[in-house]
Structure formats: structure tokens, C-alpha cells
């Protein structure tokens, strides 16, 4: 159950733990018992821990902009800083992946 904020005319702002189905209904103030309407407030990001704040930012970015990494088969980042080359077939002189997809193509794997 989420916490909702309500504002009492005499006591001020208070929070209440309520069901989501009761979110739009007014709540009774804990101090005076007066019926109080729900208020909308901004998130408390300023008092949140820096690690939590960065985790929220990271989750927001990953929702529509996933981070991708390009790596080669040798494990380096793709620019071949390790000075290795992909294995070459002795018969065709082409890298192994190209040889496999052309020579032993699988017709049932259309679109892959």
C-alpha cells in the first residue's frame, strides 16, 4: 500500500498508508480527526541519497534509451586494440562467420 499526503486545515500536512482504491477519498487527520483532502506534492529528490538519485536517473534512461556495448569476438571493444584478427578459413580466405552463413546456410532460419 502506498503513502498518500493529505492536508488538514488545523494541523497541516500528514501522510497516510492507504489502499490504491481509496486514493481519491479524503482521510481523517491523526491529530484532530478532521476529514482532509489529498494533496499532490513533488518528489523529495533533494533529501534523497545521491546513490538512490543516480539509480532513479539510470532507470529512467534505460526505459527508452538502453545502453548498448559493441564487442568483437576476441573480447575487446571492437577497435581490436588487442591486435588480434578473427580466424580465417584456409579454403576461402574469409572470416569464419562469413563462411558459415554462406556455405552452411540454414533455410529455416529466415531473417536471422
Curated annotation (Swiss-Prot):
Composition-biased stretches (Basic and acidic residues): 52-68
A Pfam family matched in the record: Zn_ribbon_8
GO cellular-component term (any): cytoplasm
Subcellular location: Cytoplasm
Keyword check for Cytoplasm: yes
Annotated keywords: Cytoplasm
Region spans: Disordered: 52-112
Principal localisation: cytoplasm
Start-end of Polar residues biased regions: 74-102
Key word Cytoplasm present: yes
Physiological role: May be a positive regulator of formamidase.
Protein name per UniProt: Putative regulatory protein FmdB
Organism encoding this protein: Methylophilus methylotrophus (Bacterium W3A1)
Name of the coding gene: fmdB
Amino acid at each position: 500500500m502506498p503513502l498518500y499526503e493529505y492536508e488538514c486545515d488545523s494541523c497541516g500536512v500528514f501522510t497516510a498508508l492507504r489502499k490504491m482504491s481509496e486514493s481519491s477519498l479524503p482521510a481523517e487527520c491523526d491529530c484532530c480527526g478532521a476529514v482532509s483532502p489529498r494533496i499532490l506534492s513533488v518528489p523529495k529528490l533533494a533529501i534523497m541519497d545521491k546513490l538512490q538519485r543516480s539509480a532513479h536517473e539510470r532507470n529512467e534512461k534505460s526505459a527508452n534509451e538502453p545502453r548498448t556495448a559493441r564487442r568483437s569476438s576476441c573480447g575487446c571493444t571492437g577497435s581490436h586494440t588487442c591486435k588480434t584478427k578473427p580466424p580465417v578459413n584456409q579454403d576461402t580466405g574469409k572470416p569464419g562467420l562469413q563462411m558459415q552463413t554462406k556455405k552452411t546456410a540454414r533455410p529455416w532460419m529466415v531473417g536471422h
